[in-house]
Amino acid sequence: MTNKLKKDHAFWAAVCLLLSIVPELLNALPEEDDDTINTDSELRPMKPLHTFCAMKAEDGPCKAMIRSYYFNMNSHQCEEFIYGGCRGNKNRFDTLEECRKTCIPGYKKTTIKTTSGAEKPDFCFLEEDPGICRGFMTRYFYNNQSKQCEQFKYGGCLGNSNNFETLEECRNTCEDPVNEVQKGDYVTNQITVTDRTTVNNVVIPQATKAPSQWDYDGPSWCLEPADSGLCKASEKRFYYNPAIGKCRQFNYTGCGGNNNNFTTKQDCNRACKKDSSKKSSKRAKTQRRRKSFVKVMYENIH
């Protein structure tokens, strides 16, 4: 009798336990079905152009930090990763454009038409991005404000695609074929009609350069004021002072600042001073010649 009661209690306890679990199971099943349906609709199967495009990003065993790109089968997009410098696999590209053309079926190069009618890759309109690392590598980017390629200091990792190792590569990729835009805040290509020449009794106006107090043909970053930066170091650096047309020394704190920052005075002069000194030297020579000519004429008369 006692054993029978124990069996009855065990049976009803099991029934109660099952009844308490069933509602939770019923509530959970629709949610799982919904998740499955959403996932299938968002990520449809995609066949890349090459088998190696399905490989995972592999940085390799070396310790370099080289910005590269790979095709991500999950997101169906080309994404950035840091390559160690050796080994790895074929799913690795130097540029985002190369990755897209190689792996994405039906990919068409994205371009933006400018006011001049020229088409440029969309990454040419990205802002300068030095990345998150602390390197001091000279690179070039296209400045959409000045409409020309300019130098900047790249930290060595991440950043964006508006980043070129050479000035020529930047210009060929992003600049307009004919660039008649002013450099910096100083107009260098305006013309005004001031002279006239008579040919066959016809007066022909001759275009001459507009007079200006000071013309500067160098890079726009040479016009930026000296910026000591945000850190606490004290490094000797040089900047170009456009007011006096010379490179001057200043103390750099080690991080931040701007591109008007050179490790040696020679680098500063080479980058900024040579362009502005040409016109001033020509003007000085012309003035000296005029003075000497007047002096000779005066001596001959007397």
UniProtKB/Swiss-Prot annotation:
Gene Ontology cellular component list: caveola; cell surface; extracellular space
Cysteines paired by S-S bonds: 53-103, 62-86, 78-99, 124-174, 133-157, 149-170, 222-272, 231-255, 247-268
Residues annotated as site: Reactive bond: 63-64, 134-135, 232-233
Keywords, comma-separated and alphabetical: Blood coagulation, Disulfide bond, Glycoprotein, Hemostasis, Protease inhibitor, Repeat, Secreted, Serine protease inhibitor, Signal
Residue stretches making up the BPTI/Kunitz inhibitor domain: 53-103, 124-174, 222-272
A GO biological-process term: cellular response to steroid hormone stimulus
SMART domains linked: KU (SM00131)
Claim: Glycoprotein is one of the keywords in the record: yes
InterPro entries per the UniProt record, alphabetical: Kunitz_BPTI, Kunitz_BPTI_sf, Prtase_inh_Kunz-CS, TFPI-like, TFPI/VKTCI-like
UniProt-annotated location(s): Secreted
Entry-listed glycosylation sites: 144, 251, 261
Signal peptide annotation: 1-28
Molecular function as annotated in GO: serine-type endopeptidase inhibitor activity
Role noted for this protein: Inhibits factor X (X(a)) directly and, in a Xa-dependent way, inhibits VIIa/tissue factor activity, presumably by forming a quaternary Xa/LACI/VIIa/TF complex. It possesses an antithrombotic action and also the ability to associate with lipoproteins in plasma.
Record note on domains: This inhibitor contains three inhibitory domains. The first domain interacts with VIIa and TF, the second one with Xa.
Protein name: Tissue factor pathway inhibitor
Organism field: Rattus norvegicus
Lineage summary: Eukaryota, Metazoa, Chordata, Craniata, Vertebrata
Gene: Tfpi
